[in-house]
Regions:
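Trp/Phe/Arg-rich N-terminal binding region typifying the photolyase-homology
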Residues: 2-144
């Protein structure tokens, strides 16, 4: 009797976006801590590709190659709609959750809301910034 490869192994997807750090990345650590296998993905955002110049795209390509090398050539770099790409990976690997860094910019927050609205379970941890917006308070009145 054959058993599904998805039944005993807990898999999470870590969706890299602007923050390609491996060290000191709270969202990546959270994704790793509660799974047996991590699937790393970078979805090539068609809007960003269209709006970027050659130098920015070359830098992104170099950065993704370096990240892939650091991950032992296990980074999935896929162009397409975020929801479709993530759903295909979830189905292919039987992943339970998609982990991300909390996004604060309007475009990224709207993108993440669209992914969540599609029924994909998103776990938001940390921030793509060294210090999350709103965490540093002015001494005079304790406002951000």
């Amino acid at each position: 009797m054959s058993q599904s490869i998805h039944s005993t192994t807990k898999r999470n997807i870590f969706w890299f976006r602007r923050d390609l750090r491996l060290a000191d990345n709270p969202a990546l650590l959270a994704a790793i801590e509660n799974c047996d296998e991590l699937i790393a993905v970078y979805v090539l955002d068609e809007k960003i590709i269209k709006d970027s110049g050659a130098k920015r795209l070359a830098y992104l390509g170099q950065s993704l190659r370096a990240l892939d090398e650091s991950l032992g050539n296990k980074l999935h770099v896929i162009a397409g709609d975020h929801v479709e790409v993530l759903k295909k990976l979830i189905e292919k690997y039987g992943a339970d959750e998609v982990h991300i860094s909390q996004e604060y910019e309007p475009y990224g927050a709207a993108r993440d809301s669209k992914v969540e609205a599609s029924g994909i379970k998103i776990v938001k941890t940390g921030s793509p910034y060294a210090v999350a917006p709103g965490r540093v308070l002015k001494p005079s009145d304790q406002t951000p």
